[in-house]
C-alpha cells in the first residue's frame, strides 16, 4: 500500500515503514504526526486519486529526530572590487517513519 502526501509545499510517495526527511515540523522526537493532506492512495485493490484530496484518508508517522541538512555554501563576488561574501545555510528537517496509511 502507498500514499502520496503533501507537507511543506512538497509531495512525497510513502508506504509503511518508509523513513523520509520533510521540512521542519513542530514536534518532539517520539511524537506522532497525522497527515490529512493525502493526494492519492493505492494498493492491491486499486488506486484512488483525490480531487484534490482523498476524503477521509490519513497517514500517521512517528518523529524519529529533528535534524539539519548539509551546508549549502553561498559565495558572492564582485569582480575587480576586492569584494566577496561567503555564507552558509543548513536547512532544518524532520525525520519521520511512516507508521500507517488509513484509506477511508
From Swiss-Prot:
GO terms for molecular function: rRNA binding; structural constituent of ribosome. The keyword rRNA-binding applies. GO terms for biological process: translation. InterPro entries: bL21-like, bL21-like_sf, Ribosomal_bL21. Keywords: Ribonucleoprotein, Ribosomal protein, RNA-binding, rRNA-binding. Transmembrane segments: none annotated. It comes from the Bacteria. Coiled coil: none annotated. The keyword Transmembrane does not apply. One of its GO terms (cellular component) is ribonucleoprotein complex. Belongs to the bacterial ribosomal protein bL21 family. This protein binds to 23S rRNA in the presence of protein L20. Part of the 50S ribosomal subunit. Contacts protein L20. This is Large ribosomal subunit protein bL21. It comes from Gluconacetobacter diazotrophicus (strain ATCC 49037 / DSM 5601 / CCUG 37298 / CIP 103539 / LMG 7603 / PAl5). The lineage of its organism: Bacteria, Pseudomonadati, Pseudomonadota, Alphaproteobacteria, Acetobacterales.
Amino acid at each position: 500500500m502507498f500514499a502520496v502526501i503533501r507537507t511543506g509545499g512538497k509531495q512525497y510517495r510513502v508506504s509503511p515503514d518508509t523513513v523520509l526527511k520533510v521540512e521542519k515540523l513542530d514536534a518532539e522526537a517520539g511524537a506522532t504526526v497525522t497527515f490529512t493532506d493525502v493526494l492519492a492512495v493505492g494498493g492491491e485493490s486499486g488506486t484512488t486519486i483525490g480531487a484534490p484530496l482523498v476524503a477521509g484518508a490519513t497517514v500517521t508517522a512517528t518523529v524519529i529526530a529533528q535534524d539539519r541538512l548539509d551546508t549549502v555554501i553561498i559565495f558572492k563576488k564582485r569582480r575587480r572590487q576586492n569584494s566577496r561574501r561567503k555564507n552558509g545555510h543548513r536547512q532544518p528537517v524532520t525525520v519521520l517513519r511512516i507508521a500507517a496509511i488509513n484509506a477511508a
